[in-house]
Amino acid sequence: MDFPRFLLSAYLLLLSFAQCQHYYLLRPIPSDTLPLLELKEDPDPIYDPREKDLNETELRSALGDFDSRFLSVGPPQDRYAGNEDLDEQELQLNLAGMMPKDIKNLDFDAPWGKKRKASKKLKRRLQMWLWSYSFCPVLYAWNDLGSRFWPRFVRAGSCYTKRSCSVPEGMVCKPAKSTHITLLRWRCVARRGALKCAWIPVQYPIITECKCSCAN
């Protein structure tokens, strides 16, 4: 098969792959609200925990499970978790996980009719090309939430957004799955003229998977 035919076949497949399902416009996607909006805190230092409130032994006991993959008490040596600074070509070379079913199950014989069928080698080549183009990696970086959270450093995920993930352009990488980790938050409430403060557990969402989806 000559190269122009290969490009035509790939383009037709991408056109079908990039079609936005109509129900995406009717049904909200739960993870669209990730990541969290920027937290707004009162800047008055009276609401900050004091040194005696930051006993690590007591806080670890109150927190329970401490997942060091996503949590750090002190500033991590490597603020970026390995893939934030990678360029587009390097990201595409680091395909991870299982090949998406919608790419794996594409009918590569349709553009050629019943008499001619694409070879296994060509099918694999097209699958890998489509996968690398529509690949949506999760980029992890450490965020400092401030002294009113413990641990204050969280490894948060975001989706790659430097280019569209479809041809024609229009689809973008968006959060598809997430998990939650438990943090402690310093909460102060005014009661009877006095300020009462304590550490309370809160759930913080972490993006774990991104997917090529409709922009709207």
Curated annotation (Swiss-Prot):
Keyword ATP-binding among UniProt keywords: no
InterPro entries: Cystine-knot_cytokine (IPR029034), Noggin (IPR008717)
Superkingdom per UniProt: Eukaryota
List of glycosylated residues: 55
TM spans (from-to): none
Keywords for the protein's UniProt record, in alphabetical order: Chondrogenesis, Developmental protein, Differentiation, Disulfide bond, Glycoprotein, Secreted, Signal
Signal peptide: 1-18
GO biological process: cartilage development; dorsal/ventral pattern formation; negative regulation of BMP signaling pathway; negative regulation of endodermal cell fate specification; osteoblast differentiation
Record has Signal as a keyword: yes
Record's subcellular location: Secreted
A Pfam family assignment: Noggin
Record-stated family: Belongs to the noggin family.
Described function: Inhibitor of bone morphogenetic proteins (BMP) signaling. May play an important role in the dorsoventral patterning of the embryo.
Assembly mode: Homodimer; disulfide-linked.
Name by which UniProt lists this protein: Noggin-1
Organism encoding this protein: Danio rerio
